[in-house]
């Protein structure tokens, strides 16, 4: 099981709680808002441990309990587009501003420039950082695609920018949601 980068496409705001018994609401995920889903925590997709941008603008952990249909949508259901790279079709997401890119180990790899895209095969997110989106390629500002590799892996992660924004109009990494 891996973590996912998700988008709320339920059509409504979904409450976020500090625990699984819903005793303390600490925020909400609005429609078309992005967040990281820590599936490794467990919860059988009923108790969903997430990382989200709270009302103070900080990253916070919490739980969505019994999510409505569409709330836990994979970001790859709403990509910016697709791109065929070396014969394989990838989902792409575009960046409003530059963002750090990391190797699979979490060590620095480089960055993606503003107005460039990243390409991935799935909605996978980081184990230690569910707010980091798993990627395979970065679009060069000079054209072409550069594989994100290192430490024996052919993928890495990009900081999707939840600490900056999480709504469709404010998140640095965006698709068509």
Q: What are the roles of these predicted feature ranges?
A:
Residues 25-69, 112-163:
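SH3/SH3-like beta-barrel superfamily modules
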Residues 42, 86, 96, 102-105, ...:
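Residue-level detector of intrinsically disordered/flexible regions characterized by low predicted structural confidence
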Residues 13-14, 23, 61, 109:
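Generic secondary-structure boundary/loop-capping signal
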Residues 1-18, 28-31, 70-100, 111-114, ...:
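SH3-family beta-barrel domains
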Residues 19-24, 102-107:
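Short alpha-helix capping/helix-loop boundary micro-motifs
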